[in-house]
Amino acid sequence: MDALHGICVNINKFYKCRRIVIEYDNCSASFTFNCVHDNRKVNCLEIVGLRRNEYVCLGKIINGDKIISVHENSVNGKIIVPVEDTFDFGLFTLKNKITDAVIKLNVYINETS
């Protein structure tokens, strides 16, 4: 799927992307980040590179025993997912409102000591 080509996930400056896995057959992308600072609080996730298509982001952010539901729309090819907390991983589905295309997006956080 062409939409996977430019997709990227950003977190604040204390998180460094360690690994990106793109699976074109399954139309999915996984991003793994390392936390390089004691403060693990994430203000938001920024999903970019959606080529100005209209997407809706549905999913869940999991942190220990806490689950936060996500439902955000894209604006100018970008989706901002507010977190304002720490999290272990997020499982998201990006649905294109025009073509019904679906992208599975997973974001994982590893603590480094």
From Swiss-Prot:
Entries under InterPro entries matching the protein: ETM (IPR035147)
One Pfam family from the record: ETM
The organism of origin for this protein: Autographa californica nuclear polyhedrosis virus
Gene: ETM
Record keywords, A-Z: Early protein
Name of the protein this chain belongs to: ECORI-T site protein ETM
Domain of life: Viruses
